[in-house]
Amino acid sequence: MNSYALDLADVLVEAGAIRFGEFRLSSGSTSPIYIDMRIVPSKPQLFRRVLGMLAEKLNDVREVDVVVGVATAGIIWATGLALLSEKPLAYVRPKRKEHGLQRVVEGIVEGRRVLVVDDVATTGSSLASAVESLREAGAEPVAAMVIVDREQGAVERLADYGVKLYSLATLREIIHAMVVKGYLDPAEATRLINLLYGESL
């Protein structure tokens, strides 16, 4: 079993960052489960714990020069990862500013290999948009990293751009880890997996 998934199960439960019900995602689809990574930085010890996992996972990624956060949720994770890895930081806005220098990409990225960071990947549309903006700014996006991959097309979408997506765990792995840890009843986990992916645990 993915050790990151086991650790994340503890973090998500302790932080109150995993919720069950009916939620509309940024992709427009609905989901019976929601991962709210935005709340984790409010718990410094848990925040540090997840950042440590990301820093360790960075060892799997080919050499990168700059860590780039996707606004807004990805910026705080990219900032922590940049500090731990002692790499420069930049970030990508969802749209161009209408004042000041009117930039989409903030930070020095031209001619540099960059890692794009976000909290959760669903379809990968936000990450793909960031990759496009970074290329327009003269950067070379070589990889992307998220804490949780919901397995709804992000890996494939980024592969179309020649960018590999790394994640600490998939949502499926986290659900399984929650069963192993005793946080979730196996029958409920099977129901969730069936709703999400049309299959059993």
Swiss-Prot record:
It catalyses: orotidine 5'-phosphate + diphosphate = orotate + 5-phospho-alpha-D-ribose 1-diphosphate. Pfam families: Pribosyltran (PF00156). Keywords: Glycosyltransferase, Magnesium, Pyrimidine biosynthesis, Transferase. Pathway: Pyrimidine metabolism; UMP biosynthesis via de novo pathway; UMP from orotate: step 1/2. The keyword Kinase does not apply. Disulfide bonds: none annotated. It is an enzyme of class 2 (transferase). Its EC number is 2.4.2.10. This is Orotate phosphoribosyltransferase. It comes from Hyperthermus butylicus (strain DSM 5456 / JCM 9403 / PLM1-5).
